[in-house]
Amino acid sequence: MATETPETIDRNALPPAGTWTFDKNHTRLEFVARHMLSKVRGRFTEFDGTVTIGERPEDSHVEVEMQTASITTDTGMRDDHLRSDDFLEVEEYPTMTFRSTELRPTGENTFQLVGDLTIKGITRQVVVDAEFNGWGPGASPDNPPLAAFSAKTEIDREDWDMTWNVAVETGGFLVSKKVQIEIETELNPVG
């Protein structure tokens, strides 16, 4: 795909129509959940993602696939538990996916992605709030152009049959049901 690139970062115009892929060196797929009173952050280190930008923004499409075994919170025992049958069951379900079904512009550089999130073979519709951060030339003339997006959503993990928890004697539960998912990505054009 031959892509014209503005000479500087353009924060207002979407990149040209076509297929763009996640730059794995400049993309983070993270999640945040509460463990009692504190927030625990984690991420997936192995993933693929494509954004197909349409001639009209609402014709665009996003697909993301994460390798569930790549989950890490940088704490081995907790990571092993997240990979177990109590949570992601990575042996049975090696991937989780998001596929957009609709894009709704909500502002000049913001939009909602409606799509199907599949975890453990269970597919549920989610709404993802996203922001276009701009596009422009790569770091050097030899580098391809890049585009950047941020996205976030909140899910109830029990909707995907991740119900493990422990009641705390003083009230409440060990792990929150709600999980925030956040993506920061730079994209490169395909071709």
Question: Where are the model-predicted features located?
Answer:
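Low-complexity, acidic/polar, glycine-enriched regions of mature
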Residues: 1-191
